[in-house]
């Protein structure tokens, strides 16, 4: 049994911090790797910015619907194992991903730190709109307003509710497991600064990450690691 298995068995309050590397095995590209979403694109950050949404809503809509949605993607071993652990323990998943795969796998306590593509709303009347409706048109059939996905765009702040839920879970956790992220994007990478100092931290990632305090690094394929838990 590896150290992570042992720690998961002993822990009572677990937080998983997940990034793009968790969803890549499900066929969803990450952003910045050589085969990622941004590869070969001239201004992807602008296309996913608040400015683009306001100034060029048609261009924003085309980019998002053509590049961001993978409705046929299925959870992989990482998602399903985390959901299984949640059935037995107090587990909170705080994810940078916006693809809804943790929920699709059955996880209930998920903080979508950057929002979710599968929650959309009309900017004019505030009504919730299904992703299916948004994928057909970004104009709300009810009031004619422009629909947007409830995700955090460049130039936008993380919702306070997501930060509050994340900090509450982090402070209570006796085990924190960072999975599939380089853990360099702020404020997500600052969450562990608010941990209970007795909490153990593990990181499972294909590349080494760095933290300013002790943690256990598993430089490995997260799918293999979670398939063996």
UniProtKB/Swiss-Prot annotation:
Listed under catalytic activity are: N(6)-acetyl-L-lysyl-[protein] + NAD(+) + H2O = 2''-O-acetyl-ADP-D-ribose + nicotinamide + L-lysyl-[protein]
Q: Does the keyword NAD apply?
A: yes
Query: What does the UniProt keyword field contain?
Result: Cytoplasm, NAD, Transferase
EC top class, as a word: transferase
Q: What is its EC number?
A: 2.3.1.286
The residues that hold NAD(+) are 20, 32, 96, 98-99, 114, 181-182, 205, 223
Which residues are in the Deacetylase sirtuin-type domain?
1-229
* Compartments, record wording: Cytoplasm
User: Which CDD domains does the entry mention?
Assistant: SIR2H
Offer an example of a GO molecular function term for this protein. Answer: histone deacetylase activity, NAD-dependent
* Listed GO CC annotations: cytoplasm
Instruction: Tell me which residues this entry annotates as catalytic.
Output: 114
NCBIfam families for this protein: PRK00481.1-1
Family classification: Belongs to the sirtuin family. Class U subfamily.
Q: What is the purpose of this protein?
A: NAD-dependent protein deacetylase which modulates the activities of several enzymes which are inactive in their acetylated form.
Entry's HAMAP family?
Sirtuin_ClassU (MF_01968)
**Name under which the protein is recorded:** NAD-dependent protein deacetylase
| Organism the protein comes from | Listeria monocytogenes serotype 4b (strain F2365)
List the taxonomic lineage: Bacteria, Bacillati, Bacillota, Bacilli, Bacillales
